[in-house]
């Protein structure tokens, strides 16, 4: 009888131990599962619409590829044109998440911090995230000539004399295009009356059109950005100084909307060393 009771007690203790081990193992397994690292969910697909000055076409297309490789959920869609036309499109309601202008004038027109300044923001627009605004790049205004330089043009001061004498045909940007506005400042510097030399001027809707006229030899010379001269393989014979036309600054800003974070991330990328290397390769410099 005692042997039977001893055996029964031993079996009971063994069963309890087995349940305890099972419970402990289950608990340990549950804890391990809860603490196991989980894969971060992929970002939601985003189409980022960027309006940028035409002079940025080549560099921005290269940077788009680089950025999308590291951000596969983001598709960058560009609209390149003159800054004046881009501003008009934005004012008319076109979708735009990030704007990069070839001059402060177009950015100022959307900046709420300048409301009250009738010259800079005449319509009192509040379209950009003011804190996001940065001076991104600087360019140079240059005098370029077609292959062979048939008129032997070498300097801006020489151009001014030839133009006043009606001896050259010059391609410039329209007055609503930043490169055209810089050109008019150069005219003012040399005392050139645009109306008086109108028959010796041809115009482009953006800087790419001006560069094309020079490349095709349709004109004797043209005034374009250094970066566009580089991209078109044109010869630069002179560069305008800040005294002649001011600094050529490219401001950038995020527009108000539902993609501000994505736009800010892309803008931050454009300020990295990797992006600046691309910009500098065609003649831009950090502002």
Predicted regions located by residue number:
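C-terminal motif of bacterial Sec signal peptides marking the signal peptidase cleavage site
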Residues: 12-15
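Exported/periplasmic ABC-transporter solute-binding proteins
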Residues: 17-69, 84, 88, 103-104, ...
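Short beta-strand-centered segments that line the small-molecule binding cleft or hinge
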Residues: 87, 93-123, 129-134
């Amino acid at each position: 009888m005692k042997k039977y009771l001893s055996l029964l007690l031993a079996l009971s203790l063994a069963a309890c131990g087995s349940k305890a081990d099972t419970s402990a193992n289950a608990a340990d397994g549950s804890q391990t599962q809860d603490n196991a690292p989980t894969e971060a969910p992929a970002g939601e697909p985003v189409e980022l619409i960027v309006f940028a000055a035409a002079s940025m076409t080549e560099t921005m297309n290269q940077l788009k590829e680089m950025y999308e490789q590291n951000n596969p959920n983001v598709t960058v869609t560009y609209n390149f044109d003159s800054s004046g036309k881009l501003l008009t499109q934005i004012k008319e309601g076109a979708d735009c998440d990030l704007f990069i202008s070839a001059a402060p004038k177009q950015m100022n027109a959307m900046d709420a911090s300048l409301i009250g300044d009738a010259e800079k923001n005449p319509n009192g627009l509040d379209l950009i995230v003011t804190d996001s605004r940065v001076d991104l790049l600087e360019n140079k205004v240059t005098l370029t000539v077609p292959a062979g330089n048939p008129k032997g043009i070498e300097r801006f001061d020489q151009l001014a004399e030839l133009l006043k004498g009606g001896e050259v045909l010059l391609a410039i940007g329209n007055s609503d295009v930043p490169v055209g506005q810089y050109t008019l400042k150069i005219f003012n510097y040399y005392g050139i009356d645009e109306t008086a030399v109108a028959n010796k001027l041809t115009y482009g809707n953006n800087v790419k059109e001006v560069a094309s006229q020079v490349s095709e030899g349709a004109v004797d010379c043209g005034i374009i950005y250094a970066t566009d001269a580089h991209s078109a393989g044109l010869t630069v014979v002179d560069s305008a100084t800040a005294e002649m036309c001011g600094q050529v600054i490219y401001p950038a800003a995020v527009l108000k909307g539902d993609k501000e974070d994505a736009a800010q991330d892309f803008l931050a990328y454009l300020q990295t060393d990797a992006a600046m290397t691309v910009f500098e390769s065609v003649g831009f410099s950090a502002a």
